[in-house]
Amino acid sequence: MTTSIIERIDAWAEKTPDFPCYEYAGTRLSYKELKRQSDAFGSFLLNNLNTDKEKPIIVYGHMSPLMLIAFLGSIKSGRAYVPVDVSMPVERIEQIKKAADPSMFICTEELPSNLTITGCPVLSQEQLMDALEKHFDEVPDKAECVKNDDNYYIIYTSGSTGNPKGVQISQNNLVSFSNWILQDFSLRQGLRFLNQAPFSFDLSVMDLYPSLLSGGTLVPLDKTITANMKDLYREIPAQNFDVWVSTPSFADLCLLDENFNQENNPSLTRFLFCGEVLAKKTATELLDRFPDAVIYNTYGPTEATVAVTQVKVTRELIEAYPSLPLGVIKPDMRLHIVDQETGEILPEGEKGEIILIGASVSKGYLNEPEKTDQVFFDYKGYQAYHTGDSGIIKDGYLFFQGRLDFQIKLHGYRIELEDIENNLKKVSYIQNCAIIPKMKDEKVDMLVAQVIPTNHDFEKEYQLSAAIKNELKEFMPAYMIPRKWIYKTEFPLTMNGKIDRKALNSEVNK
């Protein structure tokens, strides 16, 4: 049982010093080097930062080993880290920087030329390397390290106002999650883990920390590989993965390659899925192609530390229900299905809101007390969270029944539809809009934008769409930009004058 994340990771530097903890783009980082360099960086921060430790450190980059060194160095200095990926638009990065009010902004990659960070110290990649060299062999005082209920990391998720919210995850939250994953999923020492998700997406926590805590090797597939199917299909068997952690959509992409099977990936014996609905079709095909593998379906919001339920997917389970269950709750958590209006706990078999209670639940949103109070609450002395997800319990299993609001999961990313709409309304060509998820195989396949445009001079609709997307890419992440565009002169309205989303949904999902 882990009680300290850092102590457990550092222990591998003694047990297996030369074993690779991270392999990326031809470089290998050993456990000994991870400890030495994160110690050096923690020492640098303690020597150079006099600000309140409540202020986190933003770590900007992609999948360089420097990201891990910066994460753990921040923790050793007593400060939480905020991962920010290079794929984020400048405006989003600026929003996160403003909301987080960090003590430092660390760059493991070069910043975009049109982004200027002010209001806090900025450490360039070159300065980071100099700091690691200057503080070589220095070891920070263990008493300074993040501990107990201190924030460990803060991940920013989509917010309904168009501004992201920072979910605070404590050392205790992460310890609870990690112990559960290592025990319930039987993750032994020395395994090779796939890292598909960028570190700014909390699915990455499901591979990053189980890998480091079990003395394994984390192997990321960065955006240059995942964006090119030929490269992706060539790289996967070459990496000899033991543990696969991804969204179901990423597995669907890989299943398009007929060579993605047990014969070509003999060591691949565990699939862990989170982030969106796992379709029965996907699970069945994986069982067919990987007869030696175990497949786990999991569920959980960022606010409850990645995942809180799990179930082993078997052919019997697939045949038993119309859709796959999300599983059973982890031992130190409780789950209730409640009536959204009255808050009354509902019996098994009745649909209502999923409420999560216990050790995995976040303390709330960073510097956002009002938003925190809207969804977090105390339940008999335990931290609890209104997920906004609709669920039902059958035979002891939790089943997902959709969102109670306008929030959806697309390719593992949690997205507020209002967030997209608010951003679309900034575009000069858009008068009004509504975002409708297009469903396929029990999950969101793509986003459809229904738009009432302003007056324009374009002859063809595709020209208008191109102009809109050109504006959007300046301030909205690519995964949030709708794939299909439908233009209207007016929207249907409900009796109380609101956009009739049910009618629009019926048009999209015929």
Swiss-Prot record:
This protein's UniProt keywords: ATP-binding, Cytoplasm, Ligase, Nucleotide-binding
Chain residues that bind D-alanine: 202, 306, 498
PROSITE patterns: AMP_BINDING (PS00455)
InterPro entries: AA_adenyl_dom, AMP-bd_C, AMP-bd_C_sf, AMP-binding_CS, AMP-dep_synth/lig_dom, ANL_N_sf, DltA, DltA-like
Main localisation: cytoplasm
GO process annotations (BP): lipoteichoic acid biosynthetic process
E.C. numbers: 6.2.1.54
One GO cellular component term noted in the UniProt record for this chain: cytoplasm
Gene3D superfamilies on file: 3.30.300.30, N-terminal domain of ligase-like (3.40.50.12780)
Enzyme class, UniProt record, top EC level: ligase
Family statement drawn from the similarity comment of this UniProt entry: Belongs to the ATP-dependent AMP-binding enzyme family. DltA subfamily.
NCBIfam families: AA-adenyl-dom (TIGR01733), D-ala-DACP-lig (TIGR01734), PRK04813.1 (NF003417)
HAMAP family xrefs: DltA
Identification of the protein by name: D-alanine--D-alanyl carrier protein ligase
Native species: Listeria monocytogenes serotype 4a (strain HCC23)
